From Swiss-Prot:
Main localization category: membrane
Name assigned to this protein: ATP synthase subunit c
Subunit structure: F-type ATPases have 2 components, F(1) - the catalytic core - and F(0) - the membrane proton channel. F(1) has five subunits: alpha(3), beta(3), gamma(1), delta(1), epsilon(1). F(0) has three main subunits: a(1), b(2) and c(10-14). The alpha and beta chains form an alternating ring which encloses part of the gamma chain. F(1) is attached to F(0) by a central stalk formed by the gamma and epsilon chains, while a peripheral stalk is formed by the delta and b chains.
Alphabetic keyword roster: ATP synthesis, Cell membrane, CF(0), Hydrogen ion transport, Ion transport, Lipid-binding, Membrane, Transmembrane, Transmembrane helix, Transport
Protein's organism: Bacillus caldotenax
InterPro entries with a match to the protein in the record: ATP_synth_csu_bac/chlpt (IPR005953), ATP_synth_F0_csu (IPR000454), ATP_synth_F0_csu_sf (IPR038662), ATPase_proteolipid_c-like_dom (IPR002379), F/V-ATP_Csub_sf (IPR035921)
Residues with site note (Reversibly protonated during proton transport): E56
Amino acid sequence: MSLGVLAAAIAVGLGALGAGIGNGLIVSRTIEGIAAQPELRPVLQTTMFIGVALVEALPIIGVVFSFIYLGR
């Protein structure tokens, strides 16, 4: 097994781990905010979805970069 494959696997794994932790924090804080102020639910949900999308973009970029690196 080459070192490049190991590096790509670590990059993808750490990216997924970070995204999972980030998504959990975003959703938990959104639920706390909705419980505290239910009238702000639409605004908080919209902000949550934007935040989750941004957090999920990073692991996808990591996968793309690892494929590019392995293609060399």
